[in-house]
From Swiss-Prot:
This is Sodium/bile acid cotransporter 4. The record marks 87-88 as: Cleavage. It comes from Mus musculus (Mouse). Belongs to the bile acid:sodium symporter (BASS) (TC 2.A.28) family. The keyword Transmembrane helix applies. Gene3D superfamilies: 1.20.1530.20. The gene is Slc10a4. Transporter for bile acids.
Amino acid sequence: MDSLDNTTLLLAPSSLLPDNLTLSPNAGSPSASTLSPLAVTSSPGPGLSLAPSPSIGFSPEATPTPEPTSSSLTVGVAGQGSSAFPRPWIPHEPPFWDTPLNHGLNVFVGAALCITMLGLGCTVDVNHFGAHVRRPVGALLAALCQFGFLPLLAFLLALIFKLDEVAAVAVLLCGCCPGGNLSNLMSLLVDGDMNLSIIMTISSTLLALVLMPLCLWIYSRAWINTPLVQLLPLGAVTLTLCSTLIPIGLGVFIRYKYNRVADYIVKVSLWSLLVTLVVLFIMTGTMLGPELLASIPATVYVVAIFMPLAGYASGYGLATLFHLPPNCKRTVCLETGSQNVQLCTAILKLAFPPRFIGSMYMFPLLYALFQSAEAGVFVLIYKMYGSEILHKREALDEDEDTDISYKKLKEEEMADTSYGTVGTDDLVMMETTQTAL
């Protein structure tokens, strides 16, 4: 009877009774309405919990206390005003992208990126830079691949692999972003045209203000009703543009005025970028952990691997079709496949709440990982085989320029008529004059 009296005492306040709970006069115990999916269940501690059950009653016999479960602790009966039964404390952990470690890492990466852009600006030759501005064939080809081929490829991959709404939009956003700064570094490592690379990065970022909303408006309507054009963070685009233009412009000025200082800055920027990449990969793996990586579907991994590879191939193929020089082909190739994943991450933060986006926040990081790995393989192949082929070709060109065989000299003498020719009559006259002397 003690347990029954305690139960009756606990149920006495009317504020603790749900609206659909009635008291049976015969049984003397509360019973839940059969139409409600929620019923009162015994709680492991003080207070009541709501759980899906058809009905429950209180018997005068003592019943054993069930073990605590996660479901019994999630929903509690909250009375009006102050309650004598405290709610169970549930620890709240912020998402990994909202932690102080991630914010500090973003600041570190941003500072290293500015140093890298300063060093890349020191590699620009002002004379060749103007030539690419007057004849922007490479920049137009990169823009065609960047905002024409890659968004269409991302759209088709999302349809082929039947991705859900969040995953499809994450893939589409990454495909519509402008070129990233990784292409500038990789172009430098493969002896590409740095003037063309920087022009392509700047122009694609400027074009993103117009073409990126257009691509999102065209392709995103297949999954969501809210136009992502309204969610485009113009502040993030402007910040990306400033972080690219200002250091590069300063680097060009240093190269123009102080040549030796520019060479030193290039070396420092390359080493700083190498250290930044190592720290970034280690810290990203530490923050994410294997559980979050395992929650990503396998189809998303396939898309993250195939997209940058297709971008590199399309850029190189289009540059070959238009008969660009070999160094420009490599530059267009790397610029097309390298995307600005920082901008994609910023849009995903604004487009979806953290609890809804979940592991799809990882797709830009996966894309950055695989585009860096594939570009690294491209650089490694070039360093192993491409440089040897180029050296052999340069040696052949030098041999042709320094060929001083008798046949070649004879042909040049016969073809050289800049000083006139000597006829037979002039030759007889010269012989007579010499005899007279």
